[in-house]
Curated annotation (Swiss-Prot):
This is UPF0266 membrane protein YobD. The keyword Cell membrane applies. Its main location: membrane. It comes from Salmonella paratyphi A (strain AKU_12601). Pfam families: DUF986. NCBIfam families: PRK02913.1. InterPro entries: DUF986 (IPR009328).
Length: 152
């Protein structure tokens, strides 16, 4: 096993841990989930570049008769990238005392100001940061509003 294979195993393990945390652990942290809303995905250009580069590496490894283990590891990395970028949907998860946004826990008392833009983006101003929440379904904004009013 080469150093390249070890690095690939490390990246695959990191992506797998992230996917498991995002899918199974995060919704169970900090109490019961009150509301979970699907968000719009960001631009997919980065993901296309990543998966494309991994596909080029797979092709290069196969044509140069590289190690079969490396080909399988590159394929697993491409599948993990495909899952994380295209199959998994980003979510905002509301709890009793706060919410998870982009895998970060934010307490409700940190929200200083909230606005709704014309194009349906909920803008939350925190102490030093602005959150732009783009929901998949525009009707979910009303659910978020009701939940925030009930918990304030």
């Amino acid at each position: 096993m080469t150093i390249t294979d070890l690095v690939l195993i490390l990246f695959i393990a990191a992506l797998l841990v992230y996917a498991l945390y995002d899918q199974f652990i995060m919704p169970r942290r900090n109490g019961p989930t009150l509301l979970s809303i699907a968000l719009l995905r960001r631009g997919r250009v980065d993901s296309v570049i990543f998966v494309g580069l991994v596909a080029i590496l797979i092709y290069n490894n196969v044509t140069s008769h590289g190690a079969q283990m490396t080909t399988w590891l590159l394929s697993a990395l491409a599948l993990m990238g495909f899952y994380i970028f295209w199959i998994r949907t980003p979510r905002i998860i509301f709890k009793q005392r706060g919410f998870f946004f982009a895998n970060v826990w934010i307490e409700y008392n940190r929200i200083k100001e909230m606005n709704l833009s014309e194009d349906g983006v909920l803008v939350m101003q925190l102490e030093q940061r602005r959150l732009l929440i783009r929901v998949h379904n525009i009707d979910d904004l009303e659910k978020i509003y009701k939940l925030l009013i009930e918990n304030q």
